[in-house]
């Protein structure tokens, strides 16, 4: 049995909090968990969840992952705790880190996540912020690795809003040396600091391309990835974004320009006829539900690394 203790007691706030070797270590552990070749016991360990945003896959995958590891999950609903009444983050963090062994947080402001980590004495995990979604990126690259058995020569194209998911794909892609292309409307590009940091990591700067032309971005791509155009908290921008993102739908025409063996990814929920057509979503190229399942296996690996 492998003892996955390389990340013990570290925070995981960003894809940049782990090294290339550590990414591969997590992916390797994830595959072992998926194939039932690894047994880790986190009995008496407690995971605390603080979710300011709604969630299906992230919440459930963390809960199931911790349960399968023998641990317990406490769901701390902000609306039924003192968080809702404005208790300072530093006070909440110092108390919860005496009750819990690890805390996963989904919040709007990345700075709030960093504040929790600053005051917590236990590991803090980014379960999504406005800046990054690093757990999602790990599951994404696990899915890609399962499909192609290697990252060499893989081209990943993300079509849509340069949001938290795109930011984490860029950073994790840089760590793995994967060519990442982002196609988004002008003004909706990924975070500039994320782009600059990725360029520092890439040995070949040409492996990261940001464009406003989806047709160019998908040429020869092995993976086509998209996400909702309007993230949580942007409901008032939906009508405007639907107009701006017209032409950035993954449809059969766009897919035909990619590699003939290309696969389709989406972090869900998906809005058919918006970012992706129903025909493409339901095609044989769909690896979206493998991708969703892999969230659970990655979470098992990550929790094991932090706690075992």
Swiss-Prot record:
Q: Specify the pathway.
A: Amino-acid biosynthesis; L-arginine biosynthesis; L-arginine from L-ornithine and carbamoyl phosphate: step 1/3
Cellular component, GO annotation:
cytoplasm
Q: Which InterPro entries match?
A: Asp/Orn_carbamoyltranf_P-bd, Asp/Orn_carbamoylTrfase, Asp/Orn_carbamoylTrfase_sf, Asp_carbamoyltransf_Asp/Orn-bd, Orn/put_carbamltrans, OTCase_ArgI
A Pfam family annotated for this chain is OTCace
Which example biological process does GO assign this protein? arginine biosynthetic process via ornithine
Keywords on record: Amino-acid biosynthesis, Arginine biosynthesis, Cytoplasm, Transferase
Task: List where in the cell it is found.
Answer: Cytoplasm
In which residues is L-ornithine bound?
A: 164, 227, 231-232
Which PROSITE patterns does the record cross-reference, listed alphabetically? CARBAMOYLTRANSFERASE
Q: Classify the source by domain of life.
A: Bacteria
- Write out the GO MF terms: amino acid binding; ornithine carbamoyltransferase activity
KW Nucleus (keyword) present: no
As recorded in UniProt, its EC number(s) are: 2.1.3.3
The entry's carbamoyl phosphate-binding residues are: 55-58, 82, 106, 133-136, 267-268, 295
What reaction does this enzyme carry out catalytically?
carbamoyl phosphate + L-ornithine = L-citrulline + phosphate + H(+)
What job does the chain carry out? Reversibly catalyzes the transfer of the carbamoyl group from carbamoyl phosphate (CP) to the N(epsilon) atom of ornithine (ORN) to produce L-citrulline.
Per the record, the similarity remark reads:
Belongs to the aspartate/ornithine carbamoyltransferase superfamily. OTCase family.
Q: What is the protein name given in its UniProt record?
A: Ornithine carbamoyltransferase
Show the taxonomic lineage.
Bacteria, Bacillati, Cyanobacteriota, Cyanophyceae, Synechococcales
């Amino acid at each position: 049995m492998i003892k996955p203790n390389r990340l013990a007691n570290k925070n995981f706030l960003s894809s940049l909090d782990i090294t290339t070797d550590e990414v591969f270590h997590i992916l390797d552990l994830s595959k072992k968990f998926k194939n039932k070749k690894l047994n880790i016991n986190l009995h008496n360990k407690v995971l605390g969840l603080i979710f300011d945003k709604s969630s299906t896959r992230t919440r459930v995958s963390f809960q199931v992952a911790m349960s399968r590891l023998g641990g317990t999950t406490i769901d701390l609903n902000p609306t039924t705790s003192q968080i809702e009444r404005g208790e300072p983050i530093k006070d909440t963090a110092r108390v919860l880190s005496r009750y819990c062994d690890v805390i996963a947080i989904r919040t709007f402001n990345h700075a709030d996540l960093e504040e929790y980590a600053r005051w917590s004495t236990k590991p803090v995990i980014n379960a999504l912020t406005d800046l990054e979604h690093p757990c999602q990126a790990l599951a994404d690259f696990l899915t890609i690795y399962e499909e192609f058995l290697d990252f060499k020569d893989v081209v990943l194209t993300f079509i849509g809003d340069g949001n938290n998911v795109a930011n984490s794909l860029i950073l994790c892609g840089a760590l793995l040396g994967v060519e990442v292309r982002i196609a988004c409307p002008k003004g909706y590009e990924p975070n500039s600091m994320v782009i600059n940091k990725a360029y520092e990591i890439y040995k070949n700067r040409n492996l990261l391309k940001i464009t406003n032309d989806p047709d160019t971005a998908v040429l020869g791509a092995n993976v086509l990835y998209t996400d909702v155009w309007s993230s949580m908290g942007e409901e008032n921008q939906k009508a405007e974004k639907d107009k701006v993102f017209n032409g950035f739908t993954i449809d059969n025409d766009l897919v035909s320009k990619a590699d003939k063996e290309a696969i389709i990814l989406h972090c869900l929920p998906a809005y058919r006829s918006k970012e992706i057509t129903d025909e493409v979503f339901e095609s044989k190229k769909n690896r979206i539900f493998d991708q969703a399942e892999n969230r659970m296996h990655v979470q098992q690996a990550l929790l094991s690394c932090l706690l075992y």
